[in-house]
Amino acid sequence: MKSPRQFELLINVGAAIAGIGVIGYIAYAALHKDVDQPCSTRYPAATRFSLHNSEGKPLSAIALQARAGLRDLGVIDNASVVRSAGGPAEDVLEVKLRQLPAGADQDAAAHNGIEFRWSPPGMKPATAACLSYSVLLPDKFAFGSGGFLPGVFGGTAGLSRDSAAGLSVSPEWERDGRPLIASTSAGRIGRISGNKSAWPTGRWVRIEQEVVLNEPGKEYGQTSLWVDGVLTLDSRSVLLRKDAGETLSGVLVAAGYHGTPPEASSLRISPFEISWR
């Protein structure tokens, strides 16, 4: 038979173990609370890429190309601003996923869809950014050999998203439609996957992507992807830069297939928004 002192000791030990468990849970929740929430809830007010001119009318292809800056691929041929009944915005960007015509660009044979860069005033230098937009992949969308969606860029911008001189982090889809995050930095290419579900098709899907640059010499850069508010992919050990002078500059507006498109198709993207710090 245990003495009262032994019972008291057992109770105290049990209480201590329970207390440690509670403290551990609180610490875990505190560490994971931020990353579980979409990044738009934790960043300053976002800057939007407008699809309208000064008169409030949808941009023409020529005006869109002018807003795209000095370098673009496929904007005139494959991009247009269209009305979207029931979508997340009144007007959205429609991208035809077709090969660029011969002569459209010296790299036309290797590209489809569109690509350009947008740098909001005041963004550079930034070491963290949150990009958000919605995308509509048609019902029975052919994922082909994989493809890519708009992401974040920085560093020294090259002429294409595959440039060895640049830094980019973008959502992509695999052959089977599963999402992944692809990063390119100084010629290094990394991919983060693991989600078992394919990108939803036939409806609008909300995307939020967070990129946090690592301190030079340390591999703890962060890339996270939320799909319809659910954290889908997350990594906190990504080497995104080696030089403190490499910072985030804006949105890499790129959408298309890797390789030749499997069939004539298109997708739609709502006006994208980015915030930074």
Would you name each region that the model predicts?
Residues 1-7:
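N-terminal Lys/Arg-rich, disordered targeting/topogenic segments
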Residues 8-277:
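Low-complexity, Ser/Thr/Pro/Gly-rich disordered linker/stalk regions
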